[in-house]
From Swiss-Prot:
It comes from Bacillus cereus (strain ATCC 10987 / NRS 248). PANTHER family: MALONATE-SEMIALDEHYDE DEHYDROGENASE. It catalyses: 3-oxopropanoate + NAD(+) + CoA + H2O = hydrogencarbonate + acetyl-CoA + NADH + H(+); 2-methyl-3-oxopropanoate + NAD(+) + CoA + H2O = propanoyl-CoA + hydrogencarbonate + NADH + H(+). InterPro entries: Ald_DH/histidinol_DH, Ald_DH_C, Ald_DH_CS_CYS, Ald_DH_N, Aldehyde_DH_dom, MeMal-semiAld_DH, MSDH_GmP_bac. This is Malonate-semialdehyde dehydrogenase. One of its GO terms (molecular function) is malonate-semialdehyde dehydrogenase (acetylating) activity. GO terms for biological process: inositol catabolic process; thymine catabolic process; valine catabolic process.
Length: 486
């Protein structure tokens, strides 16, 4: 429930809400107002160890629960999430800042991930081939791997945890969850509803905190696998540290997603698509469009319409339905973003829409309005770096070939989009672009939960992505059985 009281956040270990054994806490502000709404503990190693012990004990019985029974239990959780959609969206807007419309969309995508997890019996099925030799049969069986952990970011406090723990638990594992210390309230509610669904104690454990919790997870010998979503430097650290300690790791990292706009595109829909991709959720998402490579032939017309429509966007508190761009997560991030905008100006890019100059009354929140640069090149920081904000760079290219070449020069390769009505252009783009997720006239090419989610290059560290069959393979181990009977 959302209240006006300042909340003292707790950990959830072995089926109980418990105080952290540490004394250090961090304030959690509402990004739209700057007012403190909670204090979250920065838990020490000892709390992680207790959570792992609880998960390890629960694994002994949970892993033996029949697969269909685990799925039925998850279906009860799914129903509770659906019944509480409105409340969950409001919590997201309160602590993350994104508009209620965006938060509602996130809730739905999270629910879809749990829907996938309820179908685990089908996804866990093995393979068999009888009579591989005289009187000998061969088969492959999938088993859970033990205690696994998830480390999740602030920008999707519901969807990303629900990519992880429902599927892992459906596969028979037990889970230790560490969500962002910037958005601890939604994590609490997810865990509350999980246990309302009747799960045994210790199957899911929540440890709040910062880097100490991350390091404790990565170094704990009883954790078999770690799922991570976050920035590129931290993803690299998580992957290298986790694998060094013998763990499976999937680490989804940063992005600099490009869109190529062709002269044969539907101009109106393309403009609205780019606006939605670049500026919704305040640009704080790894699938946001941050660079548009527009072909010269349509560049001026496209930019004129894009700028005019962008200037109509309202900035402010996400609870107000007229606002399109909410606040950034913290004052420190706002200052970082303003630094990037200033660097773009200093480097010679043309500032067409200046998000530093917000006309709406935005109070004390951490607001930066939609920002558009033209005349950007690959030498500029605003082209190279993940800004994670409503900042869009425009690069003019002569044709599709140059647009693809430009896009592939980025060190990131998460998502890429082409806007076109020409099937051959779409085919050429699909076959030659280096990105893990590709959209053709699709603004945000984040796949549905039954497909894998992962990028390439510096956008992903690991072998198996989240969701779909990739997720099931990550959270299970194979046993190949060759048998003969006398």
């Amino acid at each position: 429930m959302i209240t006006t009281e300042i909340k003292r956040v707790k950990n959830h270990i072995n089926g109980e809400w418990v105080e952290s054994t540490g004394t250090e806490v961090e304030a959690v502000p509402n990004p739209a107002t700057g007012k403190i709404i909670a204090y979250v503990p920065l838990s020490p190693k000892e709390d992680v160890e207790k959570a792992v012990e609880a998960a390890k004990a629960a694994y002994e019985t949970w892993s033996k629960v029949p697969v269909p029974n685990r799925s039925r239990q998850l279906y009860k959780y799914l129903q509770l999430l659906q019944e509480n959609k409105e409340e969950l969206a409001k919590i997201i807007t309160l602590e993350n800042g994104k508009t209620l419309t965006d938060a509602t969309g996130e809730v739905q995508r999270g629910i879809e991930a749990v829907e996938l997890a309820t179908s685990t019996p089908n996804l866990m099925m093995g393979q068999a081939l009888p009579n591989i030799a005289s009187g000998i049969d061969g088969s492959i069986w999938r088993y859970p791997i033990g205690v696994v952990a998830g480390i999740t970011p602030f920008n999707f406090p519901m969807m990303i945890p629900l990519w992880m723990f429902p599927l892992a638990i459906a596969c028979g594992n037990t889970f230790v969850l560490k969500t962002s210390e910037r958005t601890p309230l939604l994590a609490e509610r997810l865990v509350e509803l999980f246990y309302e669904a009747g799960f045994p104690k210790g199957v899911l454990n929540l440890v709040q905190g910062g880097k100490d919790v991350v390091n404790s997870i990565l170094e704990n010998k009883d954790i078999q696998a770690v799922s991570f979503v976050g920035s590129e430097p931290v993803a690299r650290y998580v992957y290298e540290t986790g694998t060094k300690h013998g763990k499976r790791v999937q680490a989804l990292a940063g992005a600099k997603n490009h869109a190529i706009v062709m002269p044969d595109c539907n101009l109106e829909k393309t403009v609205q698509g780019v606006i939605g991709s670049a500026f919704a959720s305040s640009g704080e998402r790894c699938m946001a469009c941050s660079v548009v490579a527009v072909v010269d032939e349509i560049a001026d017309e496209f930019i004129d319409v894009l700028v005019a429509e962008t200037k109509k966007l309202k900035v402010g508190d996400g609870f107000h339905e007229d606002n399109y761009v909410g606040p950034l997560i913290r004052e420190s991030h706002k200052e970082r973003v303003l630094g990037y905008i200033n660097s773009g100006v200093a480097d010679g890019a043309t500032l067409l829409v200046d998000g530093r100059k917000i006309k709406e009354e935005v109070g004390d929140g951490y607001f930066v309005g939609a920002t558009i640069f033209d005349g950007v090149n690959q030498e500029m920081k605003i082209w190279q770096d993940e800004i994670f904000a409503p900042v869009l760079s425009i690069v003019r290219v002569k044709d599709l070939e140059e647009g693809i070449k430009l896009t592939n020069q980025s060190k990131f390769a998460n998502g890429a989009v082409i806007y076109t009505s020409n099937g051959k252009h779409a085919q050429t783009f699909r076959d030659n672009i280096d990105a893990g997720m590709i959209g053709v006239n699709v603004n945000v090419p984040a796949p549905m939960a039954f497909f894998a989610f992962a990028g390439n290059k510096a956008s992903f560290f690991g072998d198996l992505g989240t969701n779909g069959t990739d997720g099931v393979q990550f959270y299970t181990r194979k046993k190949v059985v060759t048998e003969r009977w006398f």
